């Protein structure tokens, strides 16, 4: 639902509550700064009328001291407002960015399926930075220049309320212009944020896929793609600047027109004798000085609308419902009995179900394998077990006789160790990647033991920093096989009662695969193991093999019995082993 600017700004200002005292000091500084400028104009009257016109040197000799005092006061108030407002703005943006980061971490996997990484990165980095513009620069100008306008109008009315009324005629016209332009700014600001998301997404795609781009000669394609989104971003910013320039020009023409009318009225014989030289100078100076704050107030509208639009996009993410954790059952370690009952499931972004009334049972400590062609639903089962997605009745998965949704999420996910074909490593040391998410302290000896079990130590021992070696972004400094061994070491260290091996040895050479297979067999002992594999040679020793096609189990049994059936599994074996032969 589209929220009004006022609602969004109120919600944004609520973040200032923790820094209320500093914010009040900033507001006092802004008002004081404007007061010094207005007071300087007002003091021109006695200096002109009593000092110059009456040739009174006693009045004029105070002028230098007054000017110095006003400039010093102005400087003090300027520092108060600028520093305190910058402090509040940076703290609010830090809090908002931290809250957004933490909230995204707790959103369900289905949310990430529907939102691109580039767009989310843009919200965390670019949009939150735009919010600071609404809090600091915009608020500074609105309060300080707004107060200056009020003070100048007060000076004008005190000097000549009749002439000041003429100037007030333009206020409703300015208000209409600001209202119309605000809607335009808000619309363009949303387009700018969307365009920046496209720029970030295109950049992220280029950086993460640079090897494929080089390998397939796709540089020109990526250049054209980025050029389009980059130019679209430029067009939106030009629209913003054009709207800003037009609105400022119109407001300045209106103000100048009002000033011209006042000068014409003052020139009339009936008026020329009613105001003194000092009154005239104060009045004209006030009107001239009004042009600056009116221009800045018109300009700041774009910054404010840009910040409000950015805040709205951030709040839309913050209003997304976090992953539901309705479970009440706590458990340290399960036995590992898994019962999949009549499961039909489709991904939120898909129209057709991936699993169709699928049922299977995995006994505690049993090693089972899931085989089938790509897209048959094997990996979906591994996504459902840790409850990355929720099932709808009557579909149900039980763990030790208890439905998955009855377990507390943290306790449930502690029961699974996943080694996937797509290994995710963080830009940290090998040791920290192996220990990722571990809730206990670990000794160097234990860490090295795990590294040796997973055959990580073989390529680490000769490195200068050994386990403290940095792996680079997503393990770019390592080979595919080395990354997979680190993932296996991570699973060994977690020591979960249920193992999910999704093509866990697919990136390994034959020699490494044999070594890892030995480590996995030792690891799988006394654990419930689910092996998803295309290479059937890795699953021959499984207690039970389930053949899945179109989301349903079409065959099950051990390796020898399935071969004897001469069914789908037998055909797959003949095809693979025939190719290998």
UniProtKB/Swiss-Prot annotation:
UniProt KW keywords: ATP-binding, Cell inner membrane, Cell membrane, Lipid transport, Membrane, Nucleotide-binding, Translocase, Transmembrane, Transmembrane helix, Transport
InterPro entries associated with the record: AAA+_ATPase, ABC1_TM_dom, ABC1_TM_sf, ABC_transporter-like_ATP-bd, ABC_transporter-like_CS, ABC_transpr_lipidA, P-loop_NTPase, Type_1_exporter
Binding site for ATP: 372-379
Subcellular location: Cell inner membrane
Domain of life of the native organism: Bacteria
Its EC number(s): 7.5.2.6
Domain ABC transporter: 338-575
GO molecular function: ABC-type oligopeptide transporter activity; ATP binding; ATP hydrolysis activity; ATPase-coupled lipid transmembrane transporter activity
Cross-referenced Pfam families: ABC_membrane (PF00664), ABC_tran (PF00005)
EC main group: translocase
Catalysed reactions, semicolon-separated: ATP + H2O + lipid A-core oligosaccharideSide 1 = ADP + phosphate + lipid A-core oligosaccharideSide 2
Transmembrane region(s): 21-41, 65-85, 138-158, 161-181, 246-266, 271-291
Gene Ontology annotations for the cellular component aspect, listed alphabetically: plasma membrane
Record's bilayer topology term: Multi-pass membrane protein
Domain ABC transmembrane type-1: 24-306
Assembly: Homodimer.
Family assignment from sequence similarity: Belongs to the ABC transporter superfamily. Lipid exporter (TC 3.A.1.106) family.
Entry function: Involved in lipopolysaccharide (LPS) biosynthesis. Translocates lipid A-core from the inner to the outer leaflet of the inner membrane. Transmembrane domains (TMD) form a pore in the inner membrane and the ATP-binding domain (NBD) is responsible for energy generation.
Domain note: In MsbA the ATP-binding domain (NBD) and the transmembrane domain (TMD) are fused.
Name used for this protein in its record: ATP-dependent lipid A-core flippase
Organism this protein belongs to: Pseudoalteromonas translucida (strain TAC 125)
Lineage per the UniProt record: Bacteria, Pseudomonadati, Pseudomonadota, Gammaproteobacteria, Alteromonadales
């Amino acid at each position: 639902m589209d929220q009004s600017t006022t609602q969004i700004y109120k919600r944004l200002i609520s973040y200032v509550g923790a820094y209320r005292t500093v914010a009040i000091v900033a507001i006092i500084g802004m008002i004081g700064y404007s007061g010094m400028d207005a007071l300087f104009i007002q003091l021109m009257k006695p200096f002109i009328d009593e000092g110059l016109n009456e040739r009174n040197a006693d009045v004029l000799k105070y002028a230098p001291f007054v000017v110095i005092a006003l400039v010093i006061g102005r400087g003090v108030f300027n520092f108060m407002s600028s520093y305190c407002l910058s402090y509040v703005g940076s703290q609010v943006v830090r809090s908002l960015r931290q809250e957004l980061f933490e909230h995204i971490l707790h959103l369900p996997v289905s949310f990430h399926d529907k939102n691109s990484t580039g767009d989310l990165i843009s919200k965390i980095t670019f949009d939150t930075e735009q919010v600071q513009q609404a809090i600091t620069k915009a608020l500074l100008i609105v309060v300080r220049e707004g107060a200056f306008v009020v003070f100048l109008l007060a000076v004008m009315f005190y000097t000549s309320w009749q002439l000041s009324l003429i100037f007030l005629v333009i206020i409703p016209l300015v208000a209409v212009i600001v209202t119309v332009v605000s809607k335009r700014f808000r619309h363009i600001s949303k387009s700018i944020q969307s365009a920046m998301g496209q720029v970030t997404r295109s950049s992220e795609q280029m950086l993460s896929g640079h090897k494929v781009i080089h390998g397939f000669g796709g540089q020109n394609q990526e250049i054209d793609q980025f050029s389009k989104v980059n130019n679209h971003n430029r067009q939106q910013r030009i629209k913003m600047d054009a709207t800003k320039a037009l609105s400022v020009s119109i407001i300045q023409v209106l103000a100048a027109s009002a000033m011209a009318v006042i000068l014409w009225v003052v020139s009339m014989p009936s008026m020329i004798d009613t105001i003194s030289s000092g009154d005239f100078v104060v009045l004209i100076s006030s009107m001239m000085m009004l042009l600056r704050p009116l221009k800045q107030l018109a300009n700041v509208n774009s910054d404010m609308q840009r910040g409000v639009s950015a805040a709205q996009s951030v709040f839309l993410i913050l209003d997304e419902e976090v992953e539901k954790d309705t479970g009440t059952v706590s458990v340290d370690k399960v036995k590992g009995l898994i019962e999949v009952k009549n499961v039909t499931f489709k991904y939120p972004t898909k129209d057709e179900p991936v699993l169709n009334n699928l049922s299977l049972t995995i006994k505690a400590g049993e090693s089972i394998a899931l085989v089938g062609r790509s897209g048959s639903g094997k990996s979906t089962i591994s996504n459902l077990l840790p409850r990355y997605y929720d099932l709808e009745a009557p579909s149900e998965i039980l763990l030790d006789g208890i439905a998955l949704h009855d377990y507390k999420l943290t306790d449930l996910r502690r029961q699974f160790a996943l080694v996937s074909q797509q290994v995710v490593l963080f830009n940290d040391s090998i040791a920290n990647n192996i220990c990722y998410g571990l809730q206990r302290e670990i000794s160097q000896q234990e860490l090295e033991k795990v590294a040796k079990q997973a055959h990580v130590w073989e390529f680490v021992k000769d490195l200068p920093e050994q386990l403290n070696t940095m792996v680079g972004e997503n393990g770019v400094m390592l080979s595919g096989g080395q990354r997979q061994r680190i993932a296996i070491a991570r699973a060994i260290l977690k020591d979960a009662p249920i193992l999910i091996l999704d093509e866990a040895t697919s990136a390994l050479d034959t020699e490494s695969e044999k070594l890892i297979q030995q480590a996995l067999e030792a690891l799988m002992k006394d654990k419930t193991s689910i092996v998803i594999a295309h290479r059937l040679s890795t699953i021959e020793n499984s207690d039970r093999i389930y053949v899945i096609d179109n989301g349903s189990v079409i065959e099950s049994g051990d390796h020898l019995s399935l071969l004897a059936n001469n069914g789908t599994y037998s055909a797959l074996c003949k095809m693979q082993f025939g190719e290998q032969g």
